[in-house]
């Protein structure tokens, strides 16, 4: 009962936040409103606040379903040129992240390993699990760096791209039983993929499922109506709002400032690299920036949807970034640290041998 009350409290706060933000015509109001209101409430309200991870997953499945229905299959014919751009932009991003981490580590006196894990724009959950596996002590600092990046991206980026919205006549879809069945099917498939440790399963599975259904079945897919997308925004926003815990703000001031500075530097870096994409691929500014921005996959796609950017391109680029980090960058980091530990071990043994000889 207590847990239900804590969740109900977050739901009420999220609804208030979403409603206020939509009255103020702020971009993606039903995600930004809950994030800001729930986050601030943690510092004022002393009772328990809680949100189910399953509800957040449902929000992500809805976003994935919405993309899958509208995914531009023609993208596959352009994969060659897109792949080159995705690799180039991700190499710039990772090199930039490591550079930013180096400067942050020098200034905040946080060890380089923790600083890199704080700066790399992967998924927060996966980065923290990786840090625990690697026995990094500064888990709190890494979590703070990752959360502050997510929050700054989700709060600043909408205002950067809002002026670049493309005016499109929106035909709002009808809510139907077939849509409920489709979301349920996507959720079940995502859950099964999660069981076999498929990366970002709740997001990628619905997209793959719907692309497959569109390619191989004569079914017409129901579009996701605006109010269902607003529900998805709220389910995700409430979860993000609870991520910045009051105890995180008790970190040393240098680390607090370092986290904000490193997140802003990443946003500036991706803002710059988005012009490469815009120039060489002829994509709009909103599409390019949302494709490269170091935010959460689901949030960037919701934003792309709000400003009518090319969601197929944004979701492809953002998914590639996460997979690039999970499947290539992290294993390479593991190998690098193993090699360094071995080297240090050998050095220590040699030093010991010398001491014995002396």
Task: Annotate each PLM feature.
Residues 73-82, 162-177, 217-226, 250, ...:
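Membrane-interface helix termini and inter-helical loops of multi-pass transporters
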Residues 6-15, 71-102, 179, 230-231, ...:
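Entry/N-cap segments of selected transmembrane alpha helices
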Residues 107-148, 283-318:
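Alpha-helical membrane segments and immediately flanking helix-loop junctions
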């Amino acid at each position: 009962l207590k847990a239900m009350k804590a969740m109900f409290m977050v739901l009420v706060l999220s609804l208030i936040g979403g409603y206020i933000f939509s009255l103020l015509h702020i971009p993606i109001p039903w995600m930004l409103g809950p994030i800001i209101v729930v986050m601030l409430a943690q510092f004022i309200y002393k009772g328990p606040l809680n949100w189910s991870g399953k509800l957040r997953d449902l929000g992500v499945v809805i976003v994935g379903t919405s993309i899958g229905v509208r995914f531009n299959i023609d993208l596959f014919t352009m994969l060659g040129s897109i792949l080159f751009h995705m690799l180039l932009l991700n190499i710039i991003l990772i090199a930039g992240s490591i550079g930013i981490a180096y400067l942050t580590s020098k200034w905040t006196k946080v060890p380089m390993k923790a600083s890199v894990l704080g700066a790399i724009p992967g998924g927060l959950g996966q980065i923290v699990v990786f840090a625990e596996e690697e026995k990094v002590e500064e888990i709190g600092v890494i979590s703070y760096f990752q959360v502050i990046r997510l929050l700054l991206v989700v709060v600043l980026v909408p205002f950067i791209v809002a002026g670049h919205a493309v005016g499109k006549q929106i035909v709002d879809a009808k809510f139907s039983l077939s849509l409920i069945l489709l979301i349920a099917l996507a959720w079940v498939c995502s859950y099964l993929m999660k069981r076999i440790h498929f990366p970002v399963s709740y997001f990628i599975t619905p997209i793959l499922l719907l692309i497959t259904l569109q390619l191989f079945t004569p079914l017409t897919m129901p579009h996701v109506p605006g109010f269902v997308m607003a529900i998805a925004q709220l389910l995700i926003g409430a979860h993000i709002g609870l991520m910045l815990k009051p105890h995180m703000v008790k970190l040393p001031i240098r680390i607090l400032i370092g986290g904000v500075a490193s997140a802003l530097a990443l946003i500036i870096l991706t803002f710059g690299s988005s012009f490469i994409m815009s120039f060489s691929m002829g994509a709009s500014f909103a599409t390019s920036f949302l494709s490269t921005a170091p935010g959460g996959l689901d949030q960037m796609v919701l934003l792309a949807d709000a400003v009518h950017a090319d969601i197929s391109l944004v979701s492809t680029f953002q998914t590639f970034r996460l997979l690039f980090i999970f499947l290539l960058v992290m294993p390479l980091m593991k190998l690098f640290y193993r090699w360094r530990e071995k080297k240090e071990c050998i050095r220590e043994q040699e030093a010991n041998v010398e001491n014995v000889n002396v």
